[in-house]
Amino acid sequence: MKGSYKSRWVIVIVVVIAAIAAFWFWQGRNDSRSAAPGATKQAQQSPAGGRRGMRSGPLAPVQAATAVEQAVPRYLTGLGTITAANTVTVRSRVDGQLMALHFQEGQQVKAGDLLAEIDPSQFKVALAQALGQLAKDKATLANARRDLARYQQLVKTNLVSRQELDAQQALVSETEGTIKADEASVASAQLQLDWSRITAPVDGRVGLKQVDVGNQISSGDTTGIVVITQTHPIDLVFTLPESDIATVVQAQKAGKPLVVEAWDRTNSKKLSEGTLLSLDNQIDATTGTIKVKARFNNQDDALFPNQFVNARMLVDTEQNAVVIPTAALQMGNEGHFVWVLNSENKVSKHLVTPGIQDSQRVVIRAGISAGDRVVTDGIDRLTEGAKVEVVEAQSATTSEEKATSREYAKKGARS
């Protein structure tokens, strides 16, 4: 019984497998028949279709720009640091207790403005003593002069000897010298008193105070009371390669001030504009550069001491220069070249001689003329004599608008 039961299951399995195999065989024959006419038709059409594809294949899309003629400024650039025109550490010239500060931190002050006061009591006393001594010696001098006048009369009658007259004359001269010393002492005491009132030596901005009211200060303090930086005007010190020195000197000989621009770290924003002040008198042998100083009015306080900026100095303007976008300029084994478009939108390679250039544009001194069209994008797909399709650059805004329009269209189709 068990053997017959197993035999029946084996027969069932074999029948199922055979049925599946027959189904797949039949399905494959139908697919082959349906595909054969289409393949034959495609084979019949392929020679002509291939030739048409070769004749009318899609043109390589490129972007182009026209070479223009314009005046191009020539700049020398360098990295620099803003420095104050003057930096002064305000220190006391006398010793004493700091009684008052008359400025706000960060305040702009003028030369002569009162900044601080030191206790003047001791200096007033010293001045009074000097004045008293001067008055005393003046009285002594007046008496000595009267005695001298009497001696001069008495010597004529031999009532006073010539020696006594000479002694009196010496006393008068000595007292006159004492008076001069007393006057100097008075002036010194007055000066000490004046110095107890500390004033700004230059115009500028005061920094943070270095000492508080009530502290004892002296003329030997190195930190001082406050530091003043003169920022109106303010200077920029930057470096240029030694190869640019001749260009700067030649531009200076033209007699016009050289304009220097200060730009931020990213070179995206112009901070201020000034003029060249001077060149250093020697080249740094280590770096092969020379220091250059420019001065800025800085009334808007756009520049700040110790600020790092990019300097651009205008040294010349090239008139009637042929200019193209920098993206069009390429470099090959033969040198610099550009792809030029003719009236039929066919490209040809032109060797060129570049001049002044930056990230946006380049001057072409030889190789093309104003009005020539040059390829600026799609250059990697070009070959000599190839015909191309000139397309306009698509802005990011336009791309977003088109994408949005397609999205709305899809939503409309779904709804």
UniProtKB/Swiss-Prot annotation:
Topology in membrane: Peripheral membrane protein
Keyword Signal: yes
Signal peptide: 1-21
A GO MF term: efflux transmembrane transporter activity
Main localization (coarse): membrane
Bias kind Basic and acidic residues: ranges: 399-415
A Gene Ontology cellular-component term: plasma membrane
InterPro entries according to UniProt: CusB_D23, Multidrug-R_MdtA, RND_pump_MFP
Family to which this protein belongs: Belongs to the membrane fusion protein (MFP) (TC 8.A.1) family.
HAMAP family associated with the record: MdtA (MF_01422)
Task of the protein: The MdtABC tripartite complex confers resistance against novobiocin and deoxycholate.
Assembly with partners or alone: Part of a tripartite efflux system composed of MdtA, MdtB and MdtC.
Protein name per Swiss-Prot or TrEMBL: Multidrug resistance protein MdtA
Species, as recorded: Escherichia coli (strain SMS-3-5 / SECEC)
